[in-house]
A protein has these predicted regions:
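N-terminal leader/linker segments that precede catalytic domains of diphosphate-processing enzymes
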Residues: 1-147
Length: 147
């Protein structure tokens, strides 16, 4: 048991949509790089740990109205980094993702350039999971649903 492990704040998002053919729901999943130390190679919902920049940016773009501020912003950032999808924007150009991942542009600039209209009513808090205490690295993860 490792009860003294510091919990790492993180956020995960389940992006769902109606299937165009089957009348069921489709859920976005991504495959993690095999060299990542936590769940490497697994298929997962987009998500990750809160970065320091998330704290400042969540205030500047008014993510705090949801009561989850930095966690909502983290979920937004992670789904974009991992899949290229900008929630609240139709068909954001791939160039933004490539530029962000190569540190040529900040997420703040992506938000501005893509004219993202945040509709936080569609990002619904869904669950909170904490990694069991027998793991050496533990996360306090909030899950959000977005359609």
């Amino acid at each position: 048991m490792n009860d003294n492990t510091v919990l790492i704040d993180s956020a995960t998002i389940l992006v769902i949509r109606d299937s165009e053919t089957s009348g069921t729901l489709e859920v976005l999943m991504v495959k993690r790089h095999p060299d990542i130390d936590f769940a490497g190679g697994a298929y997962v919902f987009p998500g990750g740990k809160v970065d320091e920049a998330d704290l400042d940016l969540s205030k500047s773009v008014n993510f705090n109205q949801s009561g989850f501020g930095r966690l909502v912003y983290t979920a937004f950032r992670e789904v974009f980094e991992e899949s290229g999808l900008i929630l609240g924007s139709a068909n954001a150009p791939e160039k933004y993702r490539d530029s962000l991942l190569s540190d040529q542009i900040s997420l703040r600039e992506v938000i501005k350039n893509a004219s993202v209209d945040f509709d936080l009513e569609h990002m619904i808090p869904f669950a909170r999971w904490i990694t069991p205490n027998f793991y050496p690295k533990r996360f306090d993860t909030r899950f959000f649903l977005a359609k």
